[in-house]
Amino acid sequence: DVIAKQNDITIFIEVKTRTSNTMGLPEEAITLRKREHMLAAADHYAAENKIDHWQIDVIAIEGKPSMKPVITYFENAI
């Protein structure tokens, strides 16, 4: 969802949002298959762009549009 850079580290950020917990927490939507896909995509991007240092983070956003969201940041999540 987002590619950012902090110092010499490129950060791939997956953002997941849920308005209710009926389907689970936002971060629970990142299945093994999704993680594998994210790792492959990040690895390919890093190789193509000669990036040595990178990580994958996750931002989980919970809440309804009419309420203040709860935002959780998972560093090096994948």
Q: Predicted regions span which residues?
A:
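Conserved catalytic cores of phosphodiester-cleaving nucleases, focusing on short active-site segments
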Residues: 2-22, 32, 38
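Residue-level signal for pocket-adjacent positions within structured domains
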Residues: 18, 25, 69
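Mid-chain, well-packed structural core segment of small domains
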Residues: 21-52
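Domain-level recognition of nuclease-like catalytic cores that cleave nucleotide substrates
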Residues: 47-78
